[in-house]
């Protein structure tokens, strides 16, 4: 496991973040896209208006957890390369400056479900349960008519 300080450029959605990564000694990787490993959040860029409400809530929660600075934990393959997902994004997990893993927080609060690959249909039941939980807690309000 490797640990890097990074500057958050943009939270794309609840499980994807654009960052500049500080490799140390003044060396930076700029504009890297990181996929948070082990979770799936509702999509924030979708034609499903209800899902979008929950996706934007997950995105906002991740923004509040990360702020401008975060710690990125990544794994390196046997070839010495950062692990990458199917869309070429670095796979890793972010920690807040207080040391908390963002993935764990998002799961515990109902903004994300555990996901280790495979069909996203397998996670639908848990996503729907999370939706109801977030509504019941008053964390997310779905506008009437959606």
Language model features: what each stretch is:
Residues 1-146:
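Small beta-barrel nucleic-acid-binding modules, primarily SNase/OB-fold domains
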């Amino acid at each position: 496991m490797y640990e890097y300080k990074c500057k958050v450029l943009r939270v794309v959605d609840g499980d994807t973040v654009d960052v500049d990564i500080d490799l140390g000694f003044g060396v930076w990787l700029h504009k890297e896209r990181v996929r948070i490993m082990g979770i799936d959040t509702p999509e924030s860029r979708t034609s499903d208006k209800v899902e979008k409400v929950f996706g934007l809530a997950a995105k906002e929660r991740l923004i509040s957890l990360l702020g401008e600075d975060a710690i990125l934990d990544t794994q390196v393959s046997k070839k010495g390369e950062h692990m990458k997902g199917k869309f070429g994004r670095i796979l890793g997990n972010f920690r807040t400056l207080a040391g908390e893993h963002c993935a764990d927080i998002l799961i515990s609060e109902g903004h994300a479900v555990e996901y280790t690959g495979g069909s996203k249909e397998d996670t639908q039941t848990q996503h729907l349960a999370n939706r109801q939980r977030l509504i019941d807690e008053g964390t997310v309000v779905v506008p009437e008519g959606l």
